[in-house]
Amino acid sequence: MALTPKRVAFFDVDNTLMRGSSLFFLSKGMYQRGFFTKKDISNFVMANLRYRLSGVENKEEIAKIQGAACEFFRGHEAAVIEKMGIEVYDEYVSPALWQGTIEIANNHLDHDEEVWLVTATPKDLADLIAKRLGFTGALGTVAEVKDGVYTGKLIGQLLHGPNKAIAVKLLAEERGIDLANSYAYSDSHHDIPLLQAVGNPRAINPDTLLQIHALREHWPIHDFRRMRALKKIAAPVLGRLVKLGTLLSPRSWRRGR
């Protein structure tokens, strides 16, 4: 008897599942622990910034980011980086999670649907995030390890852009996933190939180009950035109103007599 194809939800990580760059948080943790210099981290930040501001696929910039990321790990023991990844998750990643995205992911889990992360982030870190959140698994960029030490090379390509769609299709073949009935969530126009690979694409905190594309294609859009901004504005205002209400209460008047 043939198994019924699975419906799965795929989530990008940076700015979709969490605010900011997971790789940047890991590199920050490594810098704070003396693994490399300010120059090392600044080179990565500049390469990442140029890529994010470019708005277009630039293979040279992607190669620079790939090279910078590989250099972070070269010569370090995998076990040490794994331990540090746990600390970085607790210090930086967990507080940066978008709770709205977590709720969406948990809703899929509640309906017995697998949840997979699909990210350019190193797979070791992506696996850790997925495990801590109770997700099914993760697809990420694979860093080569020999004799327990990172070599500074990648196995395969950076999991970025069209490569995400390719990886998801391969996973679907391996696990009997029904992509036409599955979901994908991302913030970036670079992930449009991933979103187009499933029957239910969704934009979360979309960049300008993805928002335009999503509106044109009538894809649902979730924007948790606005909700967070409103909470920041509303909290002090609400505090002032509560204080004012206390001052104007009859009990306050009686105390003032």
Name each region found by the language model.
Residues 51-67, 245-257:
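Low-complexity, charge- and small-residue-enriched intrinsically disordered regions
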Residues 21, 76, 163:
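Conserved active-site and cofactor/substrate-binding residues in soluble primary-metabolism enzymes
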Residues 18, 61, 117-118:
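Short, surface-exposed helix-loop/turn micro-motifs enriched in polar/charged residues
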Residues 23, 46, 64-66, 148-153:
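Acidic/polar active-site rim loop that often engages polyanionic ligands
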Residues 1-57:
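Active-site neighborhood of HAD-like aspartate-dependent phosphohydrolases
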Residues 62-99:
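Metal-dependent phosphoesterase signature
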Residues 14-17, 32, 72, 159, ...:
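Short N-terminal micro-motifs specific to bacterial/archaeal maturation
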